[in-house]
Amino acid sequence: GFYVWDIESLDDPRIKAKAKKLEGNPLPVKEIKSRLAKARAAGWEMIYERHTADVRKYMDRCHIDLGGVSPNLTTKDLLRGMDISSPALRYLEELYFQYGRYLMVGSSRPGTLPAGLQGKWNNIRCAPWTGAYWANVNVQMNYWPVFNCNLAELVSPYYDLWNANFKEKQRIAKEYLKEITGKDVDDVWMSGTENSAY
């Protein structure tokens, strides 16, 4: 399991229940190794074709044309010699728009966790902002373009995360408001700034 402590010795029943729920989940190493072996067996070209076909279903839903002209330069060289009025700049803006969409397509699919502040690609053990889902507009900003870009289903992981935690957030809000006002309030909820999927 994920835990090294003895679940039965936990004092808080809420933590105990959550730990028990997750205790049976195996570490993903075995599954990851299996998927990597299948990918190696399929080969680069097959993986690339499959990926391209999958992503194209989403990317073909929205187009942008700012009159950009694709120069025969790397992005780094393009940025280095940028002329504010050049068609190459408009190309770079188009590329940036498409790259943002590509990252969303790759990091938020129905049935998965939502895109975090580092998407799905964080390679740092102690990620900036703890790799959490921050409820102070940071994570929400990831999802601002999905509706305008005809990618509405990609927001479902974000909704799923918040809906799964709604009852607990409502309970915390009731306790907090009772503590500071002395009143029972039923139609409230709150979220801490930092939130974890676990």
Regions found by a protein language model. Name each.
Residues 1-133, 151-174:
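Acidic/polar, glycine-enriched structural segments that form the non-catalytic walls/loops
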Residues 171-198:
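Active-site-adjacent "gating/activation" loops or surface patches in catalytic cores
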Residues 130, 145-149, 175-181:
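Bulky hydrophobic/aromatic packing residues
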Residues 136-147:
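Well-ordered alpha-helical segments within folded domains of soluble proteins
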